[in-house]
Structure formats: structure tokens, C-alpha cells
Amino acid sequence: MRSLHDIAAPAKLNLFLHVTGRRADGYHLLQSAFMLLDWHDTLHFERRGDGALSREDRLTPLPENDLTLRAARALQEATGTTAGAHIAIEKRLPAEAGMGGGSSDAASCLLALNRLWDLHLPLSALEKIGLSLGADVPFFLRGRNAWVEGVGEQITPVTLPRARFAVVKPGRGLATKDIFASPALKRDCESATIAGFAAHPWDFGRNDLESVARKLCPEVGEAIEWLGSQDLRARMTGSGSAVFALLPPGKLLGRAPAHWAEDGWVVRECSNMEVHPLVGWAPSDDSV
């Protein structure tokens, strides 16, 4: 196999996010429900025989050492393969949004190169590599909506109804490290249960990061209030700055403020997905 094209890397929303503690090494303990969206980046891969890794940014310039290249390099180091790749990225997901765009790109890269390079690593091995890159990567590798705990490594699949969502991404982004470094962040939320979430998935819990985010980026509050003015219950996803709201059947969004487009805001209607397009691309441990 010489190439793989049109590889999707979908976004996620955190339906809720509770911070339940902090480990001695500084990592925060979380509980959350991750849901896949039909908004995605698109990746293309060409195999190289010289072992080199290169990247082409087709829509939006990315940092020189982004998660996609780091994922490819980590896979090379873990396996000792001499294969390389040229990776082209059509970046549509906004950065610093709390939607997992970089982590999703990394996961799709690991799955695609595992196939392109004929490595046949099981999913568990890819998850180990993925967790070293970012807490959200294992979720995207599993590829199903999930209840997530710990630092992102405890993943339990959940079934969610099909639904539409309004997503608003302010022009400003938020760095995850700034949110978690805030002394105002509460880190002692009581543990919740999957059963409690399953009974009311669309309005369960809250996002414990939201109050800190609104202070660092007032546009988060502006987006929530705009959705609220349309009788929609909005909250932030992940560490922001994107916010979202469930759209009831037949609900149409009103016109966004005129300055938003000029200031780089994005307003989009999305639907959730049951499974990631690449589910099954890595063998399970039982089949290896």
C-alpha cells in the first residue's frame, strides 16, 4: 500500500466535565462524557521509503511540531520501522476550542500509519502511544462515544440518542494549561455515575472549567448568553473556548452578531455520530 486518502479526524464535545482530584504528579483526575461530532479534519498519507516525515498544510498553517507529526514519530520509535510518510492535512477544526482537534488528528494518524506501514499493532499498543501524546487520544482511537475517567485512560462506551447541536467557537482560543493552572479551579467534585448520566445525558452535570474560562476569555460567556437568548441551554466543551447547545427538532438558529465573522468566530450546526469512521482499523488484542 502506497497511500491513504480522505482519512477523517472528527471533533468531540464534552457533554459534561467534572474535576474530581489531582494526582501527585500534577495530572488532574476527571469524569466526562465524550461525544463524536460530524465536523472533522481530513488527512492524506503517502508512504516514503526514506524514513522521513513531512507535512503539508492545505488550509490552515499548523505549528511545526504538531501532534500529527509527533504521533508519526512516536509510532516509528515504538516499532523501529524504517518507513516514512508525507502527511497532508486539511484543517477545519478550530484550535484551542476544547473539541479535541489535535488529539483526533493524532489518533487518525496512528491508525492510518499502522495500516500504511503494515505494522499490525493492536489497539492497546496504539492507545499506549496515544496516551503519551495527549489525554484525549485514546478516546479517538477507541472510536465510540464514551464515559471517560482518570486522566483519560479509563474509557467505557455509552450509547447516545442521535441529535443536533449548535457549536459556537469564539475568535479567541484558550490554552488548556492556563485553565488547569488557575488557582480558582475547583478540584474536588464528587464522583458521578454512568447510570445518573445515562438517565439525562443532555443536561447532566456541568463543566467545572467553565467559570475559570469565562474569566480568562469573556467571549465564552458571550457565546453562552447568545445561545441562551434563543432558549438554548449552553455550556463550554473541554477547556474551551467553544460552547455548544442541544438543538430541539425543528429549531433554527437566529442570526449571529455581525462582528463575529469579522473577529474569527465560527457558528456551526453539527450532528453526533455513533462511531468513528476508522473503527476496526486496528486489530483487537484477541485477534493478534
Language-model region placement:
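Glycine/serine-rich anion-binding loops at beta->alpha junctions
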Residues: 88-117, 135, 233-247
